[in-house]
Amino acid sequence: MNIGNNNLVLSKYPAAIEKHPDARRALCFGDSWFQYVPHPTDLNKQIARLFKRTLFLREGVAGRDSAMWKAALPRIQREIGTFGFDAILLSNGGNDIVGEELREFVKTAAQPQSTGAGPWGEIPPEVFDHIRLETFEHALRYAIKDMKEVVQMRDLLSRDTIIYVHTYDYIFPSGKAFKLGPFTMGPWVKPFLDNVGLTDPKGQRVVTSWLVDQFARALRAFVSQNANMRLVDSRGTLKTASQWENEIHPVASGFEAIAKKCWKPALTGVLE
């Protein structure tokens, strides 16, 4: 089966299914890790290259936040009900955990702390001093809730479809922004931590790694509570700052490494 271009927008997807009715089908719904403009390097594109006999419906949007996620849900529900996907790949939560939303739950060491009800275990001093734990707990809950809505749609319309979620990776708070010509986004992390008095690079990495670990913990619990869900744990894949183009996006070889080392084993047997 020679599909050719297998990473498609909605307007081209029905014709591709008609031409290749036996091909596997996957929906990629998420953020800039699934649609990193203008680079041909993001996870969606890397995974499509690995599974050339699968038709991928491209629903990634750079900078997608919770409001944008919710706005897309009616269309996503129609797609799930119409196309009978073998797999749904979700990329969500990064902006809520170590992106723009970080400014909502950082604090100075002098400001009061409320730990909330999260199962934090041992909390690093840098985290206790500079993260509003109760507020972060709410951010985690909202990120999971957004994904849960897709799971509920799947349960209603296509119960055998397998849903995949992922952990991102440990970032380096470098202060590097995303740049495209005159357009700049970010940086997302270092300025927020600097502003609350956490300026030590090692301390900043302690905090951001802990945040990613807590997101992974919440995802693991979420996956364990739902049938036909799998967690792709990509933490620790990218070990150096040079593997990151900016604070929250890997370079091309970084996306490729995550796709090959983490996503390919998880998807093999479901996609082709």
Question: How should these model regions be labeled?
Answer:
Residues G118-K145, V150, P201-T208:
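Surface-exposed cleft-lining segments at the edges of enzyme active sites
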Residues S174-R230:
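Substrate-gating cap/lid alpha-helix
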Residues G60-G63, M229-Q243:
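Acidic carboxylate-rich catalytic motifs and surrounding loops in phosphoryl-/glycosyl-chemistry enzymes
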Residues Q35-P38, D96-E100, I171-G181, K239-S242:
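Short catalytic/ligand-binding loop motif for oxyanion handling, primarily in non-cytosolic enzymes
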Residues S242-E272:
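Histidine-centered active-site loop/cap adjacent to the catalytic His
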Residues A23-L27, W33-L133:
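Conserved SGNH/GDSL esterase-like catalytic core that processes O-acyl groups on lipids
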Residues M1-D22:
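Short N-terminal or domain-adjacent regulatory/targeting segments
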Residues A139-V189:
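Hydrophobic, aromatic-enriched interface-forming segments
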